């Protein structure tokens, strides 16, 4: 595995790989690697002969009073995990390389980025989209693998690549959970043992919605209210949002249509740790 820190060097390597007709897949991360990231790498390796892993804690996607400065950066551990996963290239630039003096261009997203995460974290997705586009241009990948856990981010990136005719295929990797149902996340390390127990309520709320949908409930407001009531039973839980959206477009829906796919998406504070989660549902067809 080669570790590259210079964007121009990474571009040159990727260009040479393309000239040799090598299929390239990229997995973009902020580091603090875990089993979820390893599953993305595994999927990338199944799809392409060369895998580039990027590690970059992107300052442009963090808002004021968020955890940019304390976000975990265990680079030695990350590089060891990447090597063990048989990554070909680890691209790990610093911020001065990605946003040099005078940098002033960025992506401005549309409605899909304005709701939910976008409402609670203004400009977050503009920062995400800008760095994702830069990494696509630097790594020159044919395929980019993203996790289902950040479902709205995935929808924003798909919208961007479609709108801007970016020649790259977006692959979605399934969300991974620990045995207690908590979605695997780098931020889980912030949770105390008691908070970790309470964090399992996110999965219970998503599972309750699944049960109710399979029973025939199609009123989004009722499903959301039931999820909120369950979450509010935990003493350290504070809700940013709970919503139901169409699975691909991320448009919010009041009534779920039979045969269509939707997601319940939620962002919950457990103590001082903000967790996001989601689950996809297919609404049963009505029997004749």
UniProtKB/Swiss-Prot annotation:
One GO biological process term is: pantothenate biosynthetic process
Q: Family per UniProt?
A: Belongs to the pantothenate synthetase family.
Keywords, A to Z, come to:
ATP-binding, Cytoplasm, Ligase, Nucleotide-binding, Pantothenate biosynthesis
Positions with a binding annotation for ATP: 30-37, 147-150, 176, 184-187
- The active site of this protein is located at 37
- Name by which UniProt lists this protein: Pantothenate synthetase
Q: Which domain of life is it from?
A: Bacteria
* Function summary: Catalyzes the condensation of pantoate with beta-alanine in an ATP-dependent reaction via a pantoyl-adenylate intermediate.
SUPFAM superfamilies given for it? Answer: Nucleotidylyl transferase (SSF52374)
Q: Which organism is it from?
A: Prosthecochloris aestuarii (strain DSM 271 / SK 413)
Share what the entry says about its subunit structure, partners included: Homodimer.
Enzyme Commission code(s) on record: 6.3.2.1
Q: How is this protein annotated for GO cellular component? A: cytosol
Cell compartment(s), UniProt? Cytoplasm
Pathway in which the depicted protein is active: Cofactor biosynthesis; (R)-pantothenate biosynthesis; (R)-pantothenate from (R)-pantoate and beta-alanine: step 1/1
Residues that hold beta-alanine according to the record: 61
Positions binding (R)-pantoate in this chain are 61, 153
